[in-house]
A protein has these predicted regions:
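Class I SAM-dependent methyltransferase SAM/SAH-binding core
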Residues: 8-66
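C-terminal alpha-helical "lid/dimerization" subdomain adjacent to the S-adenosyl-L-methionine
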Residues: 36, 113-169, 179
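A short acidic, Gly/Pro-enriched loop at the edge of an enzyme's catalytic core
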Residues: 65-76
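A short SAM/SAH-binding and catalytic strip from SAM-dependent methyltransferases
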Residues: 75-89
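Short "lid" loop at the C-terminus of a central beta-strand within the Rossmann-like core
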Residues: 83, 111-115, 185
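A short glycine-rich, Lys/Arg-flanked "PGG" loop and its adjoining helix->strand segment in the class I
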Residues: 90-102
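Conserved beta-strand signature within the Rossmann-like core of class I S-adenosyl-L-methionine
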Residues: 104-111
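Core SAM-dependent methyltransferase catalytic element
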Residues: 173-197
Length: 197
């Protein structure tokens, strides 16, 4: 996304603004962060303000499934941890592609399930035991529940929508040259492509 010298980037499911801030620091573009959680947007605004990026970053309330923007508004788009939380990933991808100019880059970051049996077992143990306990120790009972939810949520998503299905869904949504790269020993995946011209 940053290699195309964009002027305006949309960051969907921006949460507290980590990716939004990174985009603002690595480009001269204006960045719009969108999230459905008012609390996440409050945290994001505090992060943006404390980083001195308020002049180029704006945060708006909205859903990835129904974006409040006209067709072909943005030069590029990113989204993070979104498709596990929507009812219709194909329709959501089409909606994301709709607001990107033809040829514009689209990229996502998502958790994944490692392909290797050994790493998958280690990942399963980590997400079912270590993550909930660490959540509880650092953030209390609420984060314990988040930790317990995350592993099964990721597993169920990839059982329902394996990687080849997701790549096909990107292409079906009007995104060309789709590629993906596993990271963190298979516990994460970056996917990217370009809006059909």
């Amino acid at each position: 996304v940053i290699g195309s010298d964009p002027k305006l980037i949309l960051d969907v499911a921006c949460g507290p603004g980590a990716v939004t801030k990174a985009l603002a620091k690595k480009t001269t573009a204006r960045i719009v962060g969108l999230d459905l959680s008012e609390e996440m947007l409050r945290q994001g605004q505090a992060n943006v303000t404390s980083s001195g990026l308020s002049e180029r970053v704006s945060l708006v309330l909205g859903r990835g499934e129904q974006l409040p923007f006209a067709d072909a508004t943005f030069d590029g788009l990113t989204f993070t941890y979104l498709l596990r939380y929507v009812e219709d990933p194909k329709a959501t991808l089409a909606e994301l592609a709709r607001v990107v100019k033809p040829g514009g880059p689209i990229a996502s970051l998502e958790f994944a399930v490692p392909a290797s049996l050994g790493w998958r077992f280690a990942w399963w143990c980590y997400t079912r035991t270590v993550l909930p306990i660490a959540g509880y120790l650092t953030g209390g009972r609420g984060w314990w529940h988040v930790g317990r939810f995350l592993g099964p949520s990721i597993s169920n998503h990839y059982k329902r929508y394996p990687v080849h299905w997701i790549i096909n869904a990107w292409e079906h949504a009007g995104i060309d040259h789709v590629e993906y790269q596993s990271m963190s020993l298979g516990g994460g995946v970056v996917t990217w492509g370009y809006r059909t011209r």
